[in-house]
């Protein structure tokens, strides 16, 4: 992983990346801790951006739907 990158989500049996609870809270804590990139389930990313409660200038949110996309994001 690159420095400052955080990953979270639930991975299903066929590789789908599922939403998790309290995603906005997790991203808020990541910002406070100095993370600059967050790879998370696409549905969580969309919900966070729609709510508009976070300063997305401080962290780049990358939504993924499948492990293949996740691996591309981290360069594997």
What are these model-derived regions, one by one?
Residues 1-76:
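Peripheral, non-AAA+ core regions of ATP-driven protein-machinery
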């Amino acid at each position: 992983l690159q420095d400052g990158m955080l990953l979270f989500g639930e991975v299903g049996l066929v590789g789908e990346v599922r939403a998790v609870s309290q995603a906005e809270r997790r991203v808020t804590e990541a910002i406070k801790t100095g993370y600059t990139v967050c790879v998370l389930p696409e549905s969580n990313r969309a919900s966070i951006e729609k709510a508009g409660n976070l300063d997305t200038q401080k962290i780049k949110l990358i939504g993924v739907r499948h492990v293949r996309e996740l691996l591309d994001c981290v360069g594997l």
